[in-house]
Curated annotation (Swiss-Prot):
Subunit structure, as described in the record: Monomer.
Protein name, UniProt field: Beta-lactoglobulin
Keyword Signal among record annotations: yes
Positions of disulphide bridges: C79-C172, C122-C134
One cellular component (GO) term of this entry: extracellular region
InterPro entries: Calycin (IPR012674), Lipocalin (IPR002345), Lipocln_cytosolic_FA-bd_dom (IPR000566)
Subcellular location: Secreted
Alphabetical keyword list: Disulfide bond, Milk protein, Retinol-binding, Secreted, Signal, Transport
Signal peptide feature range: 1-18
Organism: Trichosurus vulpecula
Length: 174
């Protein structure tokens, strides 16, 4: 019984340390993110309804002020182009995004990228600093780069979440 309690305690400590050790990238070269990205999969909180990660990214652009502009393609009856402004923050890999339909602000953090193949990002509620959704994007469809890194990030989510794999036939093509 003592061994079981010790094992559970040590496992909990390791899990807490793993959660605290995954942060956004220390440095980010925004210019290398420019271009299209295809969503591969997403993990999001059960109650999280914002569709930002449900879309392919047609274009990432840098504004003269150093912010990012995302042009995404949303699948409705047809493909609709939408633009989002991501305002830079003090941290190079974190951007603030306001979503008018939700009347809420979120922090979009670039967790990991190799710039050429994949990018992993997470949305956090600005008020609660809790990850609400994380997504895995690739430059080319079906490359499967960054899968292990994405799984590590998903394991740090502290809330119940749903995994959603992209159905490329149902998504707008970039």
């Amino acid at each position: 019984m003592k061994f079981l309690l010790l094992t559970v305690g040590l496992t909990s400590i390791c899990a807490i340390q793993a959660i605290e050790n995954i942060h956004s990238k220390e440095e980010l070269v925004v210019e290398k993110l420019i271009g299209p990205w295809y969503r591969v999969e997403e993990a999001k909180a059960m109650e999280f309804s914002i569709p930002l990660f449900d879309m392919n990214i047609k274009e990432v652009n840098r504004t003269p002020e150093g912010n990012l502009e995302l042009i995404v393609l949303e699948q409705t009856d047809s493909c609709v182009e939408k633009k989002f402004l991501l305002k830079k923050t003090e941290k190079p890999a974190e951007f603030e995004i306001y979503i008018p339909s939700e009347s809420a602000s979120y922090t979009l953090s670039v967790m990991e990228t190799d710039y050429d193949n994949y990018i992993l990002g997470c949305l956090e509620n600005v008020n609660y600093r809790e990850k609400m959704a994380c997504a895995h994007y690739e430059r080319r469809i079906e490359e499967n780069k960054g899968m292990e890194e994405f799984k590590k990030i998903v394991r740090t989510l502290t809330i119940p979440y749903t995994m959603i794999e992209a159905q490329t036939r149902e998504m707008c093509r970039v």
